């Protein structure tokens, strides 16, 4: 008998109940007892198995992006960019690749309302012929901090107070007052875009700069942009409160119902590219994750479309156990030197091993749909059937060999060991440009949100003054309006 043929699956359900070992269960209502009253006998094996399974049916929730929903579909290339990359799934117009996509809130817990103000996660897993590519992004193009040493503190400052488990503005504003680089992300976080109407009506961004490499080995830095074909729609604070009070899973329901009705969500993929030789021509560091690239100088290039046309079959198997990792790239795409990206390559795989187990890549939703081979073996919950005798490399008894070399960036890196910030911080310019691009009513909502947060009674005069100074450096009128509402003068 093929040992993998009858692995647990609904495809092999029997018409009657069984234990996990396949033994028949003739009573699933009453426990085995001594007489009608009891006590209950420990020999009721199915009762013990049922309770023990129930006790363990949940896995640790994600430390970030815990609240989310997934859907399946395809990505189709619509424009030729083969001169920029040799990535197989981008090889030519018409090429299609199966995908699974997960949307989420970032800070809040599993089961929390999806209408709460938060950045939204936008992760896409491409099941390519040459391996999985995970584009793990958000609905805003920047992040709060550029160095991963601050990342755990960033998340803790955004999450609830560890003493009371209450989310409080004073904690957030206290921490980020030490990180002026966060101001640009706050220009999104306190803006309308962090109250999206649902997942279908929001943009997505790869956030980090990556690199595209063509078959000649020429590299370009790249940023990825997802644009919804149905447009961007956001809620007001009042609408968000109403929606969240009516249905805490409104965005999940909207995504599921839309696909079930044949109204398939669709996004267009665009990229921005930059020649590495041009990196030093800007007044900011293009590899700084707190910055966007100017579209007037680096215009959006159309690439393809993402269509979600299938709902997931099982929420636990295809959402809770779904694992993304920015380290999963394919030939033709490579990492940039972005400090935060470099550390996410490790951190994502590490958290999945903790959350799901060391063999999480064997789960069907995470496993590549192409052939794959290495000597990673065994471990808890190993599900592969392997009968080879050679589990080392190299060997004259095993014909397996290294893959052919594919192009990677050939840049020369040098410098001293150092712990320092980047030279071109320029923390306020882009935040100010974004603020000035809005209509007056949108500016007013942004100012109102700052006033509300800075009015937290535990926010000190010093912290208020620092933030008003940051806002004034971005846009003088913005800082003045917030200051006048709070009767505070900048001190920086």
Curated annotation (Swiss-Prot):
Major subcellular site: other
* Binding residues annotated for heme, in chain numbering: 348
Record flagged with keyword Heme: yes
Q: Which sites are catalytic?
A: 65, 138
Database matches in InterPro entries: Catalase, Catalase_AS, Catalase_clade1/3, Catalase_core, Catalase_haem_BS, Catalase_immune_responsive, Catalase_sf
The UniProt entry's GO biological process terms, in alphabetical order, are: hydrogen peroxide catabolic process; response to hydrogen peroxide
Name used for this protein in its record: Catalase isozyme 1
Source species of the chain: Solanum tuberosum (Potato)
Q: Is Transcription regulation there in the keyword field?
A: no
Q: What is its EC number?
A: 1.11.1.6
What family classification does the UniProt entry report for this protein? Belongs to the catalase family.
Cite the GO molecular-function annotations of the record. catalase activity; heme binding; metal ion binding
Q: Which reaction equations make up its catalytic activity?
A: 2 H2O2 = O2 + 2 H2O
Return the broad EC class: oxidoreductase
Q: How does this protein assemble?
A: Homotetramer.
- Compartment list: Peroxisome; Glyoxysome
Recorded GO CC terms:
cytoplasm; glyoxysome; peroxisome; plasma membrane
| Record keywords | Glyoxysome, Heme, Hydrogen peroxide, Iron, Metal-binding, Oxidoreductase, Peroxidase, Peroxisome
Q: Which cofactor does it need?
A: heme
List the lineage, top down: Eukaryota, Viridiplantae, Streptophyta, Embryophyta, Tracheophyta
This chain's function reads: Occurs in almost all aerobically respiring organisms and serves to protect cells from the toxic effects of hydrogen peroxide.
């Amino acid at each position: 008998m093929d040992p993998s043929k009858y692995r647990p699956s609904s495809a092999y359900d029997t018409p009657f109940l069984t234990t996990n070992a396949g033994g028949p269960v003739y009573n699933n209502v009453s426990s085995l007892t001594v007489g009608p009253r009891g006590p209950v006998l420990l020999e009721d094996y199915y009762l013990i198995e049922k309770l023990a399974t129930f006790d363990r049916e949940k896995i640790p929730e994600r430390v970030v992006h815990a609240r989310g929903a997934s859907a399946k579909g395809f990505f189709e290339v619509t424009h030729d960019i083969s001169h920029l990359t040799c990535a197989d799934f981008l090889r030519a117009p018409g090429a299609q690749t199966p995908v699974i996509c997960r949307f989420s809130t970032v800070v809040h817990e599993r089961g929390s309302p999806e209408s709460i103000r938060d950045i939204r996660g936008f992760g896409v897993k491409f099941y390519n012929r040459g391996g999985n590519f995970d584009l793990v992004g958000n609905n805003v193009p920047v992040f709060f901090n550029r160095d991963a040493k601050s990342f755990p503190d960033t998340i803790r400052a955004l999450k609830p107070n560890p003493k009371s488990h209450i989310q409080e503005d004073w904690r957030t504003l206290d921490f980020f007052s030490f990180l002026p680089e966060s101001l640009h992300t706050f220009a999104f976080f306190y803006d309308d875009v962090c109250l999206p109407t649902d997942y279908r009506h929001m943009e997505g961004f790869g956030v980090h700069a990556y690199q595209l490499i063509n078959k000649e080995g020429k590299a370009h830095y790249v940023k990825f942009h997802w644009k919804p074909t149905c447009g961007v729609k956001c809620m007001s604070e009042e609408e968000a409160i109403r929606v969240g009070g009516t249905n805490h899973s409104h965005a999940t329901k909207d995504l599921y119902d839309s696909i079930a009705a044949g109204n398939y969500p669709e996004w267009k993929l665009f990229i921005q590219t930059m020649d590495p030789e041009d990196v030093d021509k800007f007044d900011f560091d293009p590899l700084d994750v707190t910055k966007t690239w100017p579209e007037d100088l680096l215009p959006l290039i159309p690439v393809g479309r993402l269509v979600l046309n299938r709902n997931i079959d099982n929420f636990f198997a295809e959402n809770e156990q779904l694992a993304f990792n920015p380290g999963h790239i394919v030939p033709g795409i490579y990492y940039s030197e972005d400090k935060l990206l470099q550390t996410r390559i490790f951190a994502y795989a590490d958290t999945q091993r903790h959350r799901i187990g060391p063999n999480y890549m064997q789960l069907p939703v995470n496993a590549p749909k192409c052939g794959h081979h290495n000597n990673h073996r065994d471990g808890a919950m190993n599900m592969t059937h392997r009968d080879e005798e050679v589990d080392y490399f190299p060997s004259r008894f095993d014909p397996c060999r290294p893959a052919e070399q594919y192009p990677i960036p050939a840049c020369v890196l040098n410098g001293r060991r150092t712990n320092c910030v980047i030279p071109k911080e320029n923390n306020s310019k882009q935040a100010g440009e974004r603020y000035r691009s809005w209509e007056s009513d949108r500016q007013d909502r942004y100012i109102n949100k700052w006033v509300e947060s800075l009015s937290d009674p535990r926010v000190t005069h010093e912290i208020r003054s620092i933030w008003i100074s940051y806002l004034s450096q971005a846009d003088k009128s913005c800082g003045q309006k917030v200051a006048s509402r709070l009767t505070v003068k900048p001190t920086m």
